[in-house]
Design a protein with these regions (language model features):
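Short alpha-beta junction capping motif
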Residues: 757-802, 882, 907
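Catalytic beta-strand/loop cores that center a nucleophilic Ser/Cys/Thr
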Residues: 785-793, 801-899, 915-960
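Beta-strand-rich binding/interaction modules
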Residues: 157-159, 245-275, 282-284, 305, ...
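Substrate-binding/catalytic cleft of secreted carbohydrate-active enzymes
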Residues: 369, 379-622
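Accessory carbohydrate-binding/adhesion or oligomerization-edge regions at the termini
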Residues: 28-110, 191, 195-198, 907, ...
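Extended acidic/polar, glycine-enriched regions
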Residues: 180-185, 251-329, 720-752
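Accessory beta-strand-rich segments of carbohydrate-active enzymes
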Residues: 45-47, 79, 95-109, 118-231, ...
């Protein structure tokens, strides 16, 4: 008979308090049993034809050698990548080979996939791993289990030719009960099959080649463990913050075949327990002490206890670490330990390019989490994957929140095989990781459909309310906010009854200009996170290629680098990657600030803080794929707008005339450690020299935890300040690190100028321009769009995700400006595309100058898509015959744009003066070729041998920001 110990009796018995443990490394819940490590050399065999089972390879001595923990593809086994490699992926892997420029990378021995970073070797199928084991005499009569911390995918185990159960979890250890093994020598054989199974969608990150997820092997702890015949199978701790107690649910397993009784001991205090022939369960409630500290991101205090079972054929113990914390919600708000919580998370797909498999050591995860925290983030969402225990342990110790997902990218209908798999994997996730305080959210899948989601979420929340449960991550589906879900992650709410609206923007909507997404939440009654915010690309720094020294090869980056060399832009890689990155950063800042300003929105899950190497290569991170910082932003700068305490301005515009006023309300997003008592908010407007030109502060007040906390209003009369100038509005809280800033531009109302007055002939006609140049005149040529060959339109936002997967997306990667050039003297700008440029260049066609001599150096270059790398100009100059030519992709004729008017003035002032002396001379034929030639005719194809690339070349330094 199963015995459940009455809670009241245990409270009477157990009156001790659990000691507090500082946030340092603690044993995981499964480590307190005698164990024999099986790490080291194993015998091995590939089984390409899947003949080993019927051929009884488990009874033979295998002859090849391999190291475990490890994966076979990382140790030279498998096949070289070829054009017919059977990738497990559906999102666009095929088709790129039809691009003639990529022909060189389809040749045998030189296959390089631009779609994702490719493995050194690829293998799908069965492999056999074998070694001898020795059972010590002290294990006589004990139950032995085989523990494989992470295996991919299905495993079967044999000892001395006897088969044990098979496992196929993608989220948890594979544990096989071997029963009682006699002391002495035995042979252990494990069959691992990494082929796609269970009809899963092929792009889920737990199974896909998109990020190298098809490894075959066993990683992490590989152990034999001994227990008594009756043992503790599980111990789950449910803390109560209000009562400062913990309820411990203990599952007792029994291989003895007999009922029995004994004592359950927690830190030396006994309680009676009984079990039947099939096992049993017990529940204890223990006080943690009146001084027990809660766990959160600011104070990740861990509690620690040891549960011991002694009695008839029972002698077992478990160490458990947990946190005193509770997550809850009310309407749209999240609460942690009764305090408002807002999440600032990033996407991660459990990919580790250097090893090819998820890290199982705590230090590796700490490095990643520390990067995230240094950029202001407090959480991580795992896409169609659940990380190993080490990730949760690191997050526990550092104070970091985790949303895990089932290992699927599928839909779940009631009673379907997918739903049964989901239930099985969910049970494993809760069992192995449920005690971790960092584990606050669980979703079944990425962007999943099907009607089972609400049932799944409700059942799991009822069974284990230590975390919140979504019906899916990412779908805009009415089911996401139906009864059962306790939070949702959505890109918009168009399908929600009575809802309707964006929760993110990737093309610069009103929310970026001082607004928010509040209207989209008007009929939502659970916490909502904005799903996969960002997805904005930056041009790569090809020096990153040298960092890939392990399993995944950066074939995609190598292809892009070869393309850049062929199109003559590789020498500008440092400038382009920096300028493109600053443009990307600007857009992330606008989007995340809109999110933080939105009332009732519980946070964001960006895609991504780091680069994503699959699905066409989405270089969407501000750190690279190996979590190294990029040149254009530090964590401290990013955290100014993505951290726990962020001042926010509601700026409806950034470009002003000097007869206008700066008017902006300012508020605070405060999810820091505590309310700010006696806080003094301040504001200042500074010039590029850093000197204040206007400033003020607001009365001291207490600032609570929350968002949309009013600070005050900024008003500045621009007529009293010099123009044209770039200024910066800075808002902060005195005596704290909380500070944020926004660039602003002020132009004179007298900017407009007549080209004729400047002695310049301005025209849209190349024929008329030629005639005027032939007479020695100065020409400002504004080529009409229909005259531009292979000249892509620019945009006010970076590339969304990537153009291999989304070829219709804008190809805009930013601008590189020669800020020392006198043509820009009256147009204040930094070296990248900031907001004074974005509306000016939107839908303007950049000029393809690959038909011009290589010596042509644009004053303003457009940075093209890294898949294509055309040499593009927005502004350039040249001598043509006796005349002098300035070419602008921006058409000033009839334009009323404030920035365009000022740029026009700057160009005409320059052209009217003595400094207008272009260094480049073009013949008439060369100039004609820019408008009439084809880039494909003049640019070296990517299939041609690239110029020698000096990996150690001294980079051109990016301008300081």
């Amino acid at each position: 008979m199963l015995v459940k110990i009455p809670r009241w009796s245990l409270v009477a018995l157990v009156t001790f308090g659990l000691g507090l443990v500082a946030p340092v490394s603690l044993p995981a819940a499964e480590t307190a049993v005698p164990a024999i490590s099986l790490a080291g050399p194993w015998r091995f065999a590939l089984d390409r034809d899947d003949a080993g089972f019927t051929g009884q390879w488990y009874a033979k001595d295998l002859t090849d050698k391999i190291q475990l923990p490890g994966i076979l593809q990382g140790q030279g086994y498998g096949d070289d990548v070829a054009m017919d490699t059977p990738w497990i992926a559906a999102l666009g892997v095929r088709g790129w080979q039809n691009n003639k420029e990529l022909a060189r990378f389809t040749e045998p021995g030189n296959v390089k996939i631009p779609w994702f970073a490719q493995p050194a070797k690829h293998y799908l199928g069965v492999a056999w791993y074998q070694r001898d084991i020795d059972i010590p005499a002290s294990w006589a009569g004990k139950r032995v289990e085989l523990f494989l911390e992470r295996a991919h995918w299905q495993t079967m185990a044999w000892v001395d030719g006897k088969q044990y159960n098979y496992e196929d979890s993608l989220v948890a250890p594979h544990v096989s009960d071997l029963g009682a093994l006699t002391p002495g020598h035995h042979q252990l054989t494990i069959r691992v099959d990494n082929r796609l199974m269970n009809n899963q969608r092929v792009d889920g990150h737990s199974v896909s080649d998109q990020l190298g997820g098809t490894w075959n092997g066993i990683v992490g702890r590989i152990e034999l463990r001994a227990t008594s015949p009756v043992w503790i199978a599980d111990a789950q701790v449910f803390p109560s913050v209000t009562k400062k107690t913990a309820v411990i649910n203990v599952t007792i397993a029994n291989d003895s075949g007999q009922a029995g009784s004994g004592n359950l001991v927690v830190n030396g205090v006994n309680a009676p327990v009984q079990w039947d022939a099939n096992g049993g369960s017990a529940q204890m409630e223990v006080p943690l002490g009146t001084n027990a500290q809660t766990w959160d991101e600011f104070h990740p205090t861990l509690q620690h206890l040891t549960v011991t079972l002694k009695g008839n054929t029972a002698d077992d113990s478990k160490d458990v670490s947990f946190g005193l914390r509770e997550i809850s919600f009310h309407e749209k708000d999240l609460f942690l330990n009764g305090r408002l919580l807002n999440l600032r998370g990033t996407h991660f797909a459990d990919e580790f390019p250097l090893t090819g498999y998820p890290a199982t050591d705590v230090d590796s995860w700490k490095k990643i989490i520390e990067v995230c925290k240094s950029y202001g983030l407090n959480g991580m969402r795992f896409h169609s994957s659940c990380p190993p225990d080490a990730a949760f342990e690191a997050a526990d110790e550092l104070g970091f929140y985790i949303q895990a997902e089932g290992p699927f990218w599928d839909s779940f209908g009631p009673g379907s095989n997918n739903s049964k798999r989901l239930d099985a994997e969910t049970a494993m996730i809760r069992k192995f990781y449920g005690n971790h305080p960092s584990f606050i959210m669980l979703s079944p899948s990425n962007e999943s459909g099907g009607a089972y989601g609400p049932t799944w979420a409700a059942a799991n929340y009822q069974a284990d309310p230590r975390r919140l449960y979504a019906t899916s991550t990412g779908n805009d589906n009415a089911l996401n906010v139906a009864t059962g879900a306790t939070y949702a992650s959505m890109p918009h709410t168009n399908s929600v009854p009575g809802g309707g609206g964006l929760l993110r923007s990737n093309n610069g909507g009103p929310a970026w200009w001082g607004g928010d997404y509040g209207d989209s939440l008007r009929n939502v009654h659970i916490p909502i996170l904005a799903h996969e915010v960002g997805q904005l690309c930056a041009y790569p720094d090809f020096d990153e290629i040298k960092e890939f020294t392990g399993f995944l090869r950066p074939s995609n980056l190598e292809v892009f680098r070869a393309s850049a060399a062929a199109h003559g832009v590789l020498d500008h890689n440092k400038e382009f990657s920096w300028a493109s990155g600053r443009f990307q950063l600007l857009s992330y800042k606008l989007e995340l600030e809109a999110n933080l300003r939105t009332p009732g929105l519980s946070g964001f899950q960006i895609l991504d803080l780091h680069d994503y190497l699959g699905q066409g290569t989405a270089l969407v991170g501000v750190v690279d794929a190996l979590w190294h910082p990029k040149s254009y932003v530090t964590g401290a700068e990013y955290a100014r707008f993505a951290g726990p305490v962020v001042p926010l301005a509601r700026l409806s515009k950034r470009v002003y005339l000097n007869n206008e006023m700066l008017e902006s309300d300012v508020e605070l997003y405060n999810f820091g450690e505590k309310p700010l008592v006696g806080a003094v908010p301040y504001w200042t407007v500074v010039g590029l020299d850093g000197k204040a030109v206007a400033q003020g502060e607001w009365p001291a007040r207490d600032l609570p935890i929350g968002k949309n906390i009013p600070l005050g209003h900024v008003s500045v009369d621009w007529s009293k300040l010099p123009a044209p100038r770039e200024y910066r509005l800075v808002v902060g809280i005195r005596g704290t690190k909380a500070e944020n800033d926004w660039n602003l531009w002020v132009y004179p109302t007298t900017a407009s100028v007549d080209p004729q007055t400047a002695g310049v002939f301005e025209t849209n006609s190349w024929t008329d321009a030629q005639d005027y140049l032939a007479k020695g005149g100065k020409v400002l040529y504004l080529p009409p769009a229909d005259s531009l060959v292979n000249s892509p339109p620019l945009d006010n936002v970076p590339i969304f995700w990537n153009r291999q997967m989304n070829p219709r997306e804008s190809a805009m990667s930013g601008l590189w400006c020669d800020i020392a050039h006198p043509a820009l003297a009256e147009f204040p700008t930094e070296a990248y595309c900031d907001l004074e440029w974005t509306e000016l260049v939107k839908n303007v066609r950049a000029i393809n100058v690959e038909g011009a001599p290589a010596a042509l150096k644009p004053i303003v270059s457009a940075v093209d898509d890294y898949n294509r790398n055309w040499k593009l100009a927005v502004l350039f100059e040249a001598k043509v015959g006796p005349g002098r030519l300035m070419v602008s992709a921006v058409n000033f004729i009839g334009s009323r744009d404030t920035s365009a008017t000022q740029l026009h003035r700057s160009l005409l002032d320059y052209m009217a003066g003595d400094k207008f002396q272009p260094l480049l001379t073009l013949t008439r034929a060369q100039a004609d070729n820019i408008w009439t030639g084809s880039a494909a005719d003049v640019a070296a194809p990517i299939g041609a041998p690239p110029p020698e690339i000096d990996e150690g070349r001294t980079p051109t330094p990016a301008p300081k920001t």
